Amino acid sequence: MKKQNNLRSLAAQAVEQVVEQGQSLSNVLPPLQQKVADKDKALLQELCFGVLRTLSQLEWLINKLMSRPMTGKQRTVHYLIMVGFYQLLYTRVPPHAALAETVEGAVSIKRPQLKGLINGVLRQFQRQQETLLNEFATSDARFLHPGWLVKRLQNAYPTQWQRIIEANNQRPPMWLRVNRTHHTRDGWLGLLEDAGMKGYPHPDYPDAVRLETPAPVHALPGFAEGWVTVQDASAQGCAVFLAPQNGEHILDLCAAPGGKTTHILEVAPEADVLAVDIDEQRLSRVYDNLKRLGMKATVKQGDGRYPAQWCGEQQFDRILLDAPCSATGVIRRHPDIKWLRRDRDIAELAQLQAEILDTVWPRLKPGGTLVYATCSVLPEENRDQIKTFLQRTPDAALSETGTPDQPGQQNLPGGEEGDGFFYAKLIKK
């Protein structure tokens, strides 16, 4: 492999782009993975996800072991040292290989003169590891979350906040959705067993299966044929609450990448579905999902605040609004969220959600159902949002999910369960 494609330096560059430039890892990582051999792609992903999951610990260690921060053109070295710490702490990479490859990464980023510095810091960490980790265990950084988010979780969940944080810091389970138009869930579980894998059904979501051990999609029976889709169990709750029926006109708003659009069509293959998203690039994923599953829907680019631009005066029997949110319920899947979000974002998102709710509600037919969903765990985006919507919307009534005082159903992330998710089912009187 070429020297400039040193895995550790690529991981350092990816993390730097996320933390310093505010880019999402899902945008940064794929082009970098094209630069490495197939056998190394999984390790590159592990290093990027792992460093972002434990970023506050790695930052704390650097501050302890270095007298001044790396700045300017040397900044990538700061993240390269983090990659070194992460390997020594959390991976099975032999320490001598972790050190050698990380030090060599300095050459790839054209900072060969800093090889000695990197080597010295990593070796100092090895010598002081036990003392440093004992001290870290009592520091504020031990939660591996930004302080503002810890405070919000403490306020919202006085008895559960630590469990939420622990769940966010874990590796997520792999959940699948069995396409009921091809197989029953039990039938597909039998095929999975025949393929030498084991899965477990979810008690509440009838299409959801958790793999005992995550696996590449090409190993899953019938993935290419559309028999199964990768989708978290909690995300599958949207179609369960929406309960789409054949022949209905259904709006899936904020639809990309299309997991919920295709789930609606699996439940109601004869439904007339309009899938809308503001992000034209992400809409290509909706088309890809529809194509793999052999389904048809109308797909449009549009802003949820201006429905006249993409649906004229149409009204719908059912609307799924998977609202733009902080994504604080899916941190274990997307650890970069912790460092991309800011405290001020929450009020701005809540305002945007309220605007979309108010403008899309008139597009629901009388007697129709709207499911408001987010992958957030923050009440400002969830229960508080729906409570104030019900107060200002006299023809809206809550159904199945919670009470007027505590509207909606809040799933919290945890262990082998689904991600953090919120649903409120509303009926138009």
From Swiss-Prot:
It catalyses: cytidine(967) in 16S rRNA + S-adenosyl-L-methionine = 5-methylcytidine(967) in 16S rRNA + S-adenosyl-L-homocysteine + H(+). GO terms for cellular component: cytosol. Keywords: Cytoplasm, Methyltransferase, RNA-binding, rRNA processing, S-adenosyl-L-methionine, Transferase. Its EC number is 2.1.1.176. NCBIfam families: PRK10901.1, PRK14902.1, rsmB. InterPro entries: MeTrfase_RsmB-F_NOP2_cat, MeTrfase_RsmB-F_NOP2_dom, NusB-like_sf, NusB_RsmB_TIM44, RCMT, rRNA_ssu_MeTfrase_B, rRNA_ssu_MeTfrase_B_ent, RsmB-like_ferredoxin. HAMAP family: 16SrRNA_methyltr_B. Specifically methylates the cytosine at position 967 (m5C967) of 16S rRNA. This is Ribosomal RNA small subunit methyltransferase B. GO terms for molecular function: RNA binding; rRNA (cytosine-C5-)-methyltransferase activity. Residues 400-412 have a biased composition (Polar residues). S-adenosyl-L-methionine binds at residues 254-260, 277, 303, 322. The active site is at residue 375. GO terms for biological process: regulation of DNA-templated transcription; rRNA base methylation. It holds the Pfam family RsmF-B_ferredox. It is found in: Cytoplasm.
